[in-house]
Amino acid sequence: MHKQTLSFQAEVAQLLNLVTHSLYSNPDIFLRELISNASDACDKLRFEALNDAALYEGDSELQVRLRYNKTANTLTITDNGIGLSEREAIENLGTIAKSGTRDFMAKLSGDQKNDAQLIGQFGVGFYSGFIVADRITVESRRAGLPATQGVRWSSEGTGEFEVSEMERAERGTSIILHLKDDARDYLNAWKLKGIINKYSDHISLPILMQKEEWKEGENGQPGEMVVTGEWETVNQAAALWTRAKKDITPEQYDEFYKQISYDSQAPLATTHNRVEGGTEYTQLLFIPAKAPMDLFNRDKAAGVKLYVRRVFIMDDAQALMPTYLRFVKGVVDSADLPLNVSRELLQESRAVKAIREGNTRRVLSMIEDLAANDADKFKAFYAEFGAVLKEGLGEDFANRERLAKLLRFASSTTDTVSVGFADYKARMKEGQDAIYYVTADTLAAAKSSPQLEIFRKKGIEVLLMADRVDEWALNYLHEFDGTPLQSVAKGAVDLGKLQDEDEKKAAEEAQTHFKPILDKLKEALKDKAKDVRATTRLVDSPACLVVQDGDMSTQLARMLKQAGQAVPEVKPILEVNAQHPLVKKLEAGEHFDDLAHILFDQALLAEGGMPEDPAAYVKRVNALLV
C-alpha cells in the first residue's frame, strides 16, 4: 500500500499549536465545526450532482452520523457528501492558502471567544479537532472515484501527516478523533446531543446517532446505558428558515447567525419572512452588532447565501443585496430560480431583481424600526454602518428619500452624531431657506472650520460631516423634503433674509474699497487660486478657501487622489476678511507676496490640506517672524 509522510506547511504547524494550546475557551466548538464541514460536503455533492446524478451512487439521502467507542476512545463524524481524493486530502488538510493564514493570524485579538469564531471564517475548522484529540484519522473517497481510490490521512497535530491509499466502499468522509484522556466526556450521548442541540440544530441534514437503552447490571454491578444497533435523528433536520417563526426561539436565530457569519456576538436585528406573489422566496436576514474589519472593501464577498428550493447554490450572492448593504448576513431561498443558476444569470434574472428589491426594502424597514423604536440600538447601528449606508444615496435612486431620513450627523450645536435632516429642519431659523453643512476630514476640523464663523455669530446651525464618503454622497442629494442642501464652503455665502441690509451694504463697500488689494492678491496667487474676493462669512479668521458651485471640493479631490484616481485640477477661491489685521497689513505693501502666499497656505491648512511646498511656507513664516 502506497504511503507518504509529508510535512505541514509552516503556517499550519503554527496554527495547530495555537489552536490546541491557547485559542478555544469552549472546546465544544470542535463538534460544531466538524458537523458544519460535513454539511458543506453534502451541499457540494448536491450541487455537483445537479449536472451528474451518477455522483449519488444510488444513495441520495445525505446525512451526518456520529459514533463513539468507549473502548477505543474514539469519536467518529461521518458524512456521505462529496468526499476527498488523495490530492484533495493533501491540499486541503495539509496546507492553507498563505494569504488566508496571514490574515487569520493578523486578526487574532487574544480574546478567546472572538478568536474562536475566526477558525471557521478562515476555513480551518477541521483543525479544531486537535483541541480534544491527540490524533486524527480521516478516511474518505470522492464521489465518482472507484472504491480502490479511497484515502486515509492521519496526523498527531505536530509537524507531519501521513497519507495512504485505502479501499473504501462508501462515498464521503469519516473523521476519527482519538480523544485525549481529559476529553473522555465526549464519549457520552447526552453530552453530544446537548452540543448538537445548541450549535447544530439548524443544520438541514439529519444528524444521526445510535440509540441507547438502559441495561441493568448483573451480579450486583451497576446498570449503564448501552448502544443499540438502531440509529435516530438528534437534530431538527430542517433548515431554520423553512420553519415557522413561532417555532423558532430568539436563541436559535442568534446561534444560526453566529454559525453563518462566524461572529461571536448576537445580531443587532433579525427579520424572517416568506414572500409570496410574482416571485416566491424566503428571506432570513441579520444586521450584525459590529462592523467587519473589511467593511469598506466594496469588492468583498457578500454575506447572503443563496439556496434554490433548499439546495445550496452559493455563499456570496452579490446580486441579492445592493453594495451599500454589504454588511447584512443571511439566507435567501428561492422557489423560482433554476437549480443550475449561474452568477451571470443572477445578474440578468427578473426574479433576482425582485428578490434584491424585496431584501433592500426589508433591511431598510429594520433600520427604520430601530430609528423609531430603539434609540440605543439605532445609535449602535449607525456608529458601525452609517458611513456605508450613505453610499446608497449614489447607488439606490429608488430608496434615496428613505435613506436620507436615516442619516445622522453632528452639528455646530451638538457633538453627538444624532441630528437628522428632519431634526435640523424643525430647528431652522425664521427666514432660513437652506440646510447648511460643512465637510472635513475629521469632526474636530469641521468644528473649527473658518467657514462656520458667520453662522455661529448668527446662531444658525450647521451640520458637520466628517466621513470620507460624505462629500461624494451629497453630490446625489440636493434637497431634503423640499429644502435645498447648501455647503458653507461652496459658492458665495448668501444668508438671504438672515442677513440685514447694513451687512449687505458693508460687504459691497468692502469689495469696492478693497478692490486694488484683491487685484494684487489675484496676481500674486494666479497659479493657486481661481479668484480672490472679500467675504462676510469670516469673523475671526483672515481667510478661507471655497470652491465655485458645481466644482469638486478640495477635500473630495484629496480623497480621490489618495485612492489613486485621476482628478481634474480645480483651483479654489480665496476669500479674505477685510476687517482682519493681517489682511489690513497687506495695504502697507511690505512683504506683500509672502503674506499673500501665507494667507493661502494657512487657509489650506485650516481645512485639512497641505501646502504644495511646505518648506517654502515655513521659510516665508520665519522671514516674517524675525
Swiss-Prot record:
The UniProt annotation puts the region (A) at 1-343
Matches recorded under SMART domains: HATPase_c (SM00387)
Q: What is its main location?
A: cytoplasm
Localization terms from the record? Cytoplasm
> Can you name a GO cellular component term?
cytoplasm
Q: Which UniProt keywords apply?
A: ATP-binding, Chaperone, Cytoplasm, Nucleotide-binding, Stress response
Quaternary organization: Homodimer.
Q: Name the chain's protein.
A: Chaperone protein HtpG
User: Where does this protein come from, organism-wise?
Assistant: Polaromonas sp. (strain JS666 / ATCC BAA-500)
Task: Please state the gene responsible for encoding this protein.
Answer: htpG
